[in-house]
């Protein structure tokens, strides 16, 4: 064997160069496809040789194993040159001194990038010529993914068959002619020039032998080289694309010379390479090296080594040839190099053209990850879902995870800008789980979020990734100090969640740590690069940075520049994009911001230069921003369908609507009232459309109370007193004392009653029969006390009269008692109660009467009490006794007998005594019928019909409204129809919102959830419902969009139908048209790079309705009937929320704010203020310094709120001007508006 054979060395995988210096001395070789992976220990003196080796070569017959290790040096060790890495061979790599110590080695770079530094074992073996040939040369390329659970056993059987075949060949003396070792041994003695010409590569000029000895070519090792770290500067290189002519190819090394695979079709695994016994190399550790039906592609670049950081003692080059696969994705540099060289492969060795086109298309638009995943479905996802993650990611979320993992692998930062509701939080959590499970990177990570969603993030971590230790860093200074106990202890926590305010307050603490990942939620608020917050966060030490936002593109592109510079403070080098000097603020403004802002503000159509600028901007942003809309993933999310429901006004609504419009005050307000008058009119008309009770309540009718007419006549007192005092004897008789009761004498027998009447002796009493006297009655003696005789005479007469009246009273009482008789009598009732005794057979012994005492007598049911009679007539009273008299007067006896006091005996004040109270009250007060609540409103009539059908079909409903009083009416409506519901309004506490939403989502018995559109959107997820009703539209369309997203978001499994109620032929129909016009106008404004088209020059406000595609003129549909359901087109892109060109000027804003504050109800204004307060609580974290105090009271419409917050004049001492005096001419009108807006524009005059 020649000396060159002994000096032949093999290039070890580039993973050695990416080893962590802290992990020196620890080796591990992972093989996830097999359970019996071989491992080598650190003990170099261990004499035990592993059964199988990862890399085998034939040298001098020795079986020594060289285990090499090299620390990580991403700058000085490697350099990216297209698809190759230039490595420096040193004595640490190859211990044999016969090989040049400074021999540069050119290595082809694998498609994947090293994602995480790891310490790996490297095994180098030398075998004699008589050693066993490598059986891996016969491994087939797997075509399909194995789904059988016995995959390992089948692979083991296949390996055994291949080894037996090789052993049989060696015993026969033939050996394995296709072995890599055989080919290497045959080419070992040839010079490098001969090898290059033999395999079809041109020899570079001036390059020949190295140090007088020919260079050696490395064998096609079974360990595929891993990618190396990129360098910060591009190395100047001489790039030669070397093709392989067909006539010079060694046919013994082509795939056609390989034997037919012996593996059954069902055992083929796509994307994996079967190694040897119990060894399967998975895609996570190495790239597959063979494809069934694919030709091996040999491509070598020869590049001069000029890197200053790499120590170089010679000019030699070692060319390493590696195999690539047609099915695997190549990196961007490879595709670009092939396109630049213009190389075309021969028919036998070129890629499949269709697959190349798909790969290049995916690289040109890396945003469409779903399509790319579909094309790569044969090889499966490149990043597996972390095993610690609970639940299953959706396909587009899996694509987002792969994109985030690729950012980590490529040492890049990025912006995840998915639309709200697509799960940016869960994708971020999955990324951290992937780093922990697959990369061994457990943190520590820093997540900065708004204050209102800190607990939401913590709940999401506990729900989906409970294996992570999460620290929620918030509270006062003392609480935060307690939470910092063990701050620097390893594995105390892996993720720290805090807010923007706290991270600034404790920046000296956060700045000391070296964070693994720094993630900013709602990062679109960090857009002012001059702010202290932006500069503070920029100074934090973090390996990677990730921004989460739903609106990455704001009003101007300079805000986007702030985000991109935050990700890449050092600018973008030539290895990432063609734009050099990106970090230059001035140049970026000149290149992109100024042309785009000019095109948008002027409304002119974009010229070719501007469109080219937009294309360059898109090219710049694609590698760093991932943006998916719901319309793009609608195949994975349930569909969303919007409908407009036109409702007819009821008779009462139409009467009130027409009556209000015909008022003179209404005409005056519309003509001379300004904004305040117009807004007041609109609000009143909207109240009529929502429900007439909001405009005018149905009255509760009562009788007219008046004094009694008889009181005005003086003789009435005398006549009443004479009538009441006429029968003195009867008046003094107590009815109860004499037994004058209807039902009090039923215990008396009829025999006793008749006996009393027979033996009545009332006429036998004294003075019973008074003798008739003729003539005049003698006058009573005078009461004269002047003489004894006259006094005694008067006294005798008085005693006689008293005795006479006493006997008359006794006689009348006795006659009354003897004359009473029962209605039925005890004899009759006893006869009825004992009636069953007569029906008994003669041979049955008669039972005691006490036995039947427990039974109700049959006649008792005919005798009902007053409460029972009142209850039986309750339905009649409720239905018909509803008309009170027109007028009532007080009782005359109250005025006739002023000295009498009302009776207040406890027995009379008992509610059971007054059985006719309900009927008497209804005769006095007439309440509106409960059913009129529904029949007075056309919207409620339509809602009743739709809810009835939806409930029968098993749907669940959300009802949103702007007005709080409408929620009260909806509560009465739902209670009247028997629907179970929950209510959420602006007065609901933030901590109670989560409880209500979870109860609704978990309890399917709750049919309806009614909520105010201003109840706040933080933490509200109502995916339990699949139908959304907008009873009325909010002033701010963004509030309605948030309400839609509460049901149509992650977790929704059914299609969502959205119904918007509109009263036909009213002001609501015009408001809907204006909303559609604004939606289409906003759709044309900076949406996902849509700076295209010349709509800006030809679309106007009038043309947008009817002429613009997407708007249907529904006026003719509801012209005759006045009702119906119209389907509208769901917008494919979200409406821009912050657009300067659509915002009104300051004067209009102030007028609108004042008008809404005046005309809205106090409950609605309070709900709006609370919702605005929640928004301001988050926005305060992004405000920089105190605002300048204006000289006048400024009133602005806040973002995402229907009602603006008005400033009271008393707070600042200013006086808000009134607009009672209207200008008399156009000039005065213009001057008035200019004077009002002068203070607003004064800061911009300079």
From Swiss-Prot:
Residues 1-53, 60-79, 109-188, 202-292, 314-381 are annotated as: Disordered. ATP binds at residues 418-425. GO terms for cellular component: Swr1 complex. It is an enzyme of class 3 (hydrolase). Keywords: Activator, ATP-binding, Chromatin regulator, DNA-binding, Helicase, Hydrolase, Nucleotide-binding, Nucleus, Transcription, Transcription regulation. InterPro entries: Helicase_ATP-bd, Helicase_C-like, INO80/SWR1_helicase, P-loop_NTPase, SNF2-like_sf, SNF2/RAD54-like_C, SNF2_N. Pfam families: Helicase_C, SNF2-rel_dom. Residues 939-1092 form the Helicase C-terminal domain. Residues 226-255 have a biased composition (Polar residues). It is found in: Nucleus. It comes from the Eukaryota. Residues 149-166, 320-331, 338-362 have a biased composition (Acidic residues). It catalyses: ATP + H2O = ADP + phosphate + H(+). GO terms for molecular function: ATP binding; ATP hydrolysis activity; DNA binding; helicase activity; histone binding. Belongs to the SNF2/RAD54 helicase family. SWR1 subfamily. Catalytic component of the SWR1 complex which mediates the ATP-dependent exchange of histone H2A for the H2A variant HZT1 leading to transcriptional regulation of selected genes by chromatin remodeling. Component of the SWR1 chromatin-remodeling complex. This is Helicase SWR1. It comes from Cryptococcus neoformans var. neoformans serotype D (strain B-3501A).
């Amino acid at each position: 064997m020649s000396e060159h054979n002994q000096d032949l060395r093999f290039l070890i995988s580039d993973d050695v160069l990416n080893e962590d210096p802290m992990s020196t001395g620890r080796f591990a070789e992972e093989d996830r496809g097999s359970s019996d992976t071989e491992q080598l220990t650190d003990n170099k003196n261990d004499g035990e040789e592993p059964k199988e080796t990862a890399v085998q070569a034939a040298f001098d017959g020795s079986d020594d194993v060289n285990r090499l290790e090299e620390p990580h040096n991403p700058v000085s060790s490697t350099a990216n040159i297209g698809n190759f890495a230039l490595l420096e061979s040193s004595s640490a790599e190859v211990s044999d001194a016969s090989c040049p110590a400074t021999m540069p080695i050119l290595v082809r770079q694998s498609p994947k990038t090293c994602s995480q530094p790891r310490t790996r074992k490297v095994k180098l073996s030398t075998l004699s010529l008589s050693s066993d040939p490598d059986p891996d040369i016969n491994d087939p390329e797997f075509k399909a993914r194995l789904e059988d659970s016995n995959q390992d056993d089948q692979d083991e059987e296949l390996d055994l068959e291949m080894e037996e075949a090789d052993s049989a060949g060696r015993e026969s003396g033939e050996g394995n002619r296709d072995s890599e070792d055989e080919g290497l041994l045959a080419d070992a003695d040839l010079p490098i020039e001969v090898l290059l010409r033999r395999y079809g590569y041109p020899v570079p000029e001036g390059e020949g032998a190295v140090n007088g000895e020919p260079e050696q070519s490395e064998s096609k090792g079974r360990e595929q080289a891993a990618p190396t770290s990129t360098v910060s500067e591009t190395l100047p290189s001489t790039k030669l694309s070397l093709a392989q002519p067909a006539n010079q190819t060694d046919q013994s090394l082509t795939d056609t010379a390989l034997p037919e695979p012996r593996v059954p079709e069902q055992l083929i695994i796509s994307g994996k390479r079967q190694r040897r016994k119990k060894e399967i190399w998975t895609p996570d550790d190495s790239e597959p090296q063979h494809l069934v039906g694919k030709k091996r592609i040999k491509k070598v670049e020869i590049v001069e080594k000029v890197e200053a950081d790499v120590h170089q003692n010679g000019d030699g080059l070692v060319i390493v040839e590696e195999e690539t696969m047609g099915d695997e994705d190549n990196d961007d540099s490879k595709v670009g190099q092939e396109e630049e060289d213009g190389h075309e492969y021969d028919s036998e060795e070129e890629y499949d053209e269709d697959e190349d086109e798909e790969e290049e298309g995916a690289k040109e638009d890396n945003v469409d990850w779903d399509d790319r995943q579909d094309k790569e479905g044969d090889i499966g996802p490149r990043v597996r879902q972390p095993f610690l993650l609970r639940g299953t990611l959706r396909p587009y979320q899996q694509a987002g995870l792969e994109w985030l993992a690729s950012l980590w692998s490529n040492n890049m930062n990025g912006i995840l800008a998915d639309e709200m509701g697509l799960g940016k939080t869960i994708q971020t959590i999955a990324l951290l789980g992937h780093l922990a499970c697959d990369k061994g990177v457990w943190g520590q990570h820093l997540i900065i979020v708004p204050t209102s969603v800190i607990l939401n993030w913590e709940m999401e971590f506990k729900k989906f990734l409970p294996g992570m230790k999460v620290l929620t860093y918030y509270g006062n200074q003392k609480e935060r100090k307690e939470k910092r106990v063990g701050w620097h202890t390893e594995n105390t926590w892996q993720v720290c969640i805090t807010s923007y305010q706290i991270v600034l307050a404790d920046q000296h603490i956060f700045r000391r740590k070296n964070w693994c990942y720094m993630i900013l939620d709602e990062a679109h608020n960090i857009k002012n690069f001059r702010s202290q917050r932006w500069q503070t966060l920029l100074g934090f030490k973090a390996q990677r940075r990730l921004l989460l936002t739903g609106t990455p593109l704001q009003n101007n592109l300079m805000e986007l520049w702030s985000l991109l510079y935050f990700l890449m403070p050092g600018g973008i080098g030539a290895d990432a994009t063609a734009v050099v000097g990106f970090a230059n603020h001035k140049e970026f403004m000149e290149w992109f911001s100024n042309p785009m802002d000019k095109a948008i503000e002027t409304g002119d159509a974009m010229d070719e230069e501007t469109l080219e600028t937009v294309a360059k901007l898109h090219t710049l942003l694609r590698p760093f921003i991932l943006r998916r809309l719901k319309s793009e993933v609608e195949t994975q999310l349930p569909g969303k369908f919007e409908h407009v429901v036109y409702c007819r006004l009821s008779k009462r609504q139409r009467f009130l609507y027409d009556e209000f419009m015909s008022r003179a005050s209404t005409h005056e307000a519309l003509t001379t009232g300004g904004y305040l008058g117009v807004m007041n009119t609109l609000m009143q008309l909207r109240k009529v459309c929502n429900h007439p009770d909001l405009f005018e309540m149905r009255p509760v009718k009562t009788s007219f109370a008046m004094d009694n007419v008889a009181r005005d006549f003086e003789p009435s007192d005398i006549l009443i007193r004479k009538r009441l005092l006429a029968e003195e004897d009867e008046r003094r008789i107590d009815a109860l004392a004499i037994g004058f009761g209807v039902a009090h004498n039923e215990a008396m027998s009829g025999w006793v009653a008749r006996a009393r009447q027979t033996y009545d002796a009332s006429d036998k009493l004294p003075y019973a029969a008074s003798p008739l006297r003729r003539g005049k009655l003698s006058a009573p003696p005078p009461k004269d006390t002047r003489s004894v005789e006259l006094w005694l005479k008067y006294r005798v007469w008085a005693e006689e009269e008293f005795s006479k009246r006493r006997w008359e009273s006794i006689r009348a009482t006795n006659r009354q008692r003897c004359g009473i008789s029962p209605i039925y009598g005890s004899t009759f009732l006893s006869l009825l109660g004992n009636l069953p005794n007569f029906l008994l057979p003669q041979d049955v012994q008669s039972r005691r009467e006490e036995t039947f005492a427990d039974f109700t007598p049959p006649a008792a049911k005919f005798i009902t009490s007053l409460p029972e009679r009142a209850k039986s007539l309750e339905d009649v009273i409720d239905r018909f006794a509803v008309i009170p008299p027109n007028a009532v007067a007080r009782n005359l006896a109250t005025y006739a007998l002023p000295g009498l006091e009302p009776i207040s005996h406890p027995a009379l004040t008992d509610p059971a005594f007054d059985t006719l109270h309900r009927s008497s009250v209804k005769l006095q007060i007439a309440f509106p019928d409960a059913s009129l609540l529904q029949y007075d409103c056309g919207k409620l009539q339509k809602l009743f019909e739709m809810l009835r059908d939806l409930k029968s079909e098993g749907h669940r409903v959300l009802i949103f409204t702007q007005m709080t009083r409408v929620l009260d009416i909806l509560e009465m409506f739902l209670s009247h129809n028997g629907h179970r519901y929950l209510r959420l309004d602006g007065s609901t506490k933030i901590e109670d919102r989560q409880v209500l939403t979870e109860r609704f989502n978990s309890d399917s018995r709750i049919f309806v959830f009614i909520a105010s559109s201003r109840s706040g959107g933080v933490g509200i997820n109502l995916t339990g419902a699949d139908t959304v009703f907008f009873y009325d539209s909010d002033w701010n369309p963004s509030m309605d969009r948030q309400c839609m997203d509460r049901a149509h978001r992650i977790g929704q499994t059914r299609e969502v139908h959205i119904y918007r109620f509109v009263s036909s032929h009213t002001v609501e129909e015009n408001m809907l048209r204006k909303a559609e016009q604004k939606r289409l106008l906003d759709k044309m404004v900076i949406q996902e790079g849509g700076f295209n088209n010349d709509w800006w020059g030809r679309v106007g406000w009038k043309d947008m309705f009817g002429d613009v595609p997407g708007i249907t003129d529904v006026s003719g549909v509801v012209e005759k009937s006045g009702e119906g359901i119209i389907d509208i087109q769901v917008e494919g892109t979200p409406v821009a929320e912050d657009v300067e060109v659509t915002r009104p000027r300051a004067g209009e804003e102030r007028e609108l704010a004042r008008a809404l504050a005046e005309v809205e109800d106090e409950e609605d204004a309070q709900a709006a203020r609370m919702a605005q307060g929640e928004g301001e609580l988050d926005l305060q974290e992004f405000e920089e310094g105190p605002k300048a105090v204006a000289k006048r009271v400024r009133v602005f419409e806040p973002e995402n709120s229907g009602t603006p917050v008005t400033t009271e004049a008393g707070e600042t001492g200013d006086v808000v001007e009134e607009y009672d005096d209207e200008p008399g001419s156009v000039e005065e009108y213009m001057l008035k508006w200019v004077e009002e807006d002068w203070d607003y524009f004064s800061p911009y005059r300079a």
